[in-house]
């Protein structure tokens, strides 16, 4: 009989923990949840206090049988799933499904995978916290109710196969509203005036000092008048102020701040950051990665202090205690930090090393002294004028935490870097001026959200929790309500007036403005679904309501509220809204926009959501003749497309001519513009316009695709037509019966025989679950 069985969530964690505990302990993994609500059924008995109907998925049944047998033969079962609500629910499901007994079942938690933390957890077991379980169950059931009841409404009113979620829908609303703010934004111009003054330095050498007018000038005429007033004027140092400035280090990382900073500094997506953090945690390098706490343990602060003294000296040490400001913080008891502060670097992939370095620096910085700076501001008066210029300089007296870490920010602005030193100045000093430049600048529209800034906004609104940010952002993109992309900048004209040697020069320049990278854009489907839900289910889309639901989950977790009564209150209001909305009949399809009339047929022209996305339509379903449809082009929006642009779409597909005796045509499909020749689709490059592409250009694209296909297909076998050796993005591989298999680097693909291919497939199929190289092939796109 096995003395002790420990069950954790992941196999990687199991191997590490088994080494710490020794031969009396066997550690197995549950691979996450072992049961859940039934996928294709509602699975909630509303009339019986919202009783959930759980099932063990088919792919977990063998695992559950193994865990049952091992638990039955163990003297003590230790449930060691993660310490958040999700982890507590996993422990409870294991207890229920494995039919464990209270007398020999112990619940243990730890927020780092180190020997001392594991042994301490074994010494301090506790019972399963049913309040945390109920909070998780309430979230799961409420989200199932919303998704299961709203989705059919969307299928009937908007488009089949759409789905809705409580937190996801609010995230989409934020992105839609920001997009509309951007489109509604009216740019205002004003002139920013800067001057270069020539000032002697300590050696008497003339150096340039830049200063800026303290106000913006609204019009070109006013700017010109100001420069004219500066001709022959005297510029004098009216005042000099010097003040000390302290900069305090930011708190250690929570889940959301790590996601934001990793995006800014490393360019990682939210999902990528969480995947890497999970690996670091399971390898024992960092503490638990789903947390909204900024606290550090005494062990961490002492370790930080020792590391700082060793590397930088005692004057850099300033132990601090940070308080968690997030209301309802509950996911863990400590911030994300390295398990051992003396480990400045780790072994791992390049991405893991970068993320660890970021976490280490942020943690160390939080326990370091303030940065001490000195800021000097000189005010420069203009004779005969009330306006003044100011010149600002900043010098670091003691770098403190800046020695290791500088926080990044999302918003770019036009502020000058003040970390320059001003030359020696004295009050009353007259200044010789060089050029004075009035540059036309423009107010900036609100920026689109990045994944990181969306996480920050959700956290500010109290929506979601550390465990939900990454799944929310992934889900809204997978459902094609939002897409992440880049936007090319637009050329803009701006005016510059320069006063130099008593002469004013008037010039126009151009600049590229509005370029954006990796931003979140709402799709037409996302906009239509958002507008529909906002109109008919305002509560679900209300920020305060969604945040209040999170607070109610917190109250359940703290034992201050009954989860069933909260479910009842919600359902009694929500369910009638669903039934009422289904009963409403609308004249037009939800989201349909009438653009005008087709001048040829006299029929109405509209845009709406079709089966494969937004389409333009001529005519209606009531006409004798079937309506004509045209797929909208990428970059076009249902909200902004004009009648003329919609009519242009009906010129596609168009025939370009013949090539090799077959017709060549160009059109726009579900995946964008294409050339079609002999039943083969070729995607158009980004710069190519389907309305202007020539037959010669299309022929070149056809030949390029053929060449790529020839390079892709390395080898076939007549006796086994389903097996082929292909050259893919990550190198050569075997494809066979819908699955892909890696070819080892030391093997030349062309030298493989059918027999050796089948042997490679057999070896890879026999590998343990979770380590197999076999992958299902994705369906091909046109």
Explain the meaning of each model-derived region:
Residues 259-261, 265-272:
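A conserved hydrophobic secondary-structure block that centers on an alpha-helix together
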Residues 16-20, 92-93, 172-179, 361:
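Short active-site loop/helix that positions an aromatic residue
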Residues 237-241, 248-262, 287-291, 445-457, ...:
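Short acidic, hydrophobic short linear motifs in intrinsically disordered regions
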Residues 2-5, 16, 25, 151, ...:
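Basic, low-complexity terminal or inter-domain segments flanking catalytic cores
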Residues 113-197, 242-246:
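C-terminal or mid-to-C-terminal helical accessory/interaction module adjacent to the motor/catalytic core
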Residues 1-141, 149-150, 214, 409-413, ...:
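Intrinsically disordered, low-complexity regulatory segments
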Residues 217-253, 426-432, 439, 544, ...:
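Metal- or metallocofactor-binding catalytic centers and their adjacent structured scaffolds
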